[in-house]
Amino acid sequence: MKKLSILAALAASPAMAATGPFFSLSNTNFIVTLAFLIFMGILVYAKVPGRILGMLDRRAVQIRSELEEARALREEARTILASYDRKQKEVQEQAARIVASARDEAQAAAEQAKADLKASIARRLAAAEDQIASAEAGAVRAIREQAISVAVAAASDVLARQMTPAATSASIDESIKEVEARFH
């Protein structure tokens, strides 16, 4: 406070450069200087500089607390941003894993479908081959039966033309003896 008073007194020193008696009530410079000093004295007496300093100190404390709060908010925002970035990376990785899994499953399903198709084709081929073999066996059997029928008919025609009743009777007797010999 003393420094402020000395500064105010020194600030009034240019008024001393005026002409004429300085300490006269007719000198406006003296009146202005006197009014300024009285005003400064009233301010000092009313403790205005202390109040101003107190207000400035409170404002400085308030600004410091706001700065600390801003720092805390900035750190919290950084933490939230880092958390968001991590979660975004995790989601992207999970999406990539899901896509890869779906691709693998689709590929496995396609391979399974190919294998099932090959197995179905193999079964159908085997069934067709079995049907062909069965048809061949049936055809061979039918041809044999037909050949046997034709051979029996031809043999009976040949035997009927060549055999006499006495030879037929002798052949029947011989066949009966042969059957009896085989059963006994």
Curated annotation (Swiss-Prot):
Keyword Cytoplasm attached: no
GO molecular function: proton-transporting ATP synthase activity, rotational mechanism; proton-transporting ATPase activity, rotational mechanism
Entry's localization field: Cell inner membrane
Keywords: ATP synthesis, Cell inner membrane, Cell membrane, CF(0), Hydrogen ion transport, Ion transport, Membrane, Transmembrane, Transmembrane helix, Transport
A GO CC term attached to the entry: proton-transporting ATP synthase complex
Membrane topology: Single-pass membrane protein
Pfam families: ATP-synt_B (PF00430)
UniProt cross-references to InterPro entries, sorted A to Z: ATP_synth_b/b'su_bac/chlpt (IPR002146), ATP_synthase_B_chain (IPR050059)
Top-level taxonomic group: Bacteria
TM spans (from-to): 4-24
Function of the molecule: F(1)F(0) ATP synthase produces ATP from ADP in the presence of a proton or sodium gradient. F-type ATPases consist of two structural domains, F(1) containing the extramembraneous catalytic core and F(0) containing the membrane proton channel, linked together by a central stalk and a peripheral stalk. During catalysis, ATP synthesis in the catalytic domain of F(1) is coupled via a rotary mechanism of the central stalk subunits to proton translocation. Component of the F(0) channel, it forms part of the peripheral stalk, linking F(1) to F(0).
Family statement: Belongs to the ATPase B chain family.
Subunit structure: F-type ATPases have 2 components, F(1) - the catalytic core - and F(0) - the membrane proton channel. F(1) has five subunits: alpha(3), beta(3), gamma(1), delta(1), epsilon(1). F(0) has three main subunits: a(1), b(2) and c(10-14). The alpha and beta chains form an alternating ring which encloses part of the gamma chain. F(1) is attached to F(0) by a central stalk formed by the gamma and epsilon chains, while a peripheral stalk is formed by the delta and b chains.
PANTHER family: ATP SYNTHASE SUBUNIT B, ATP SYNTHASE SUBUNIT B', CHLOROPLASTIC
Protein name: ATP synthase subunit b 1
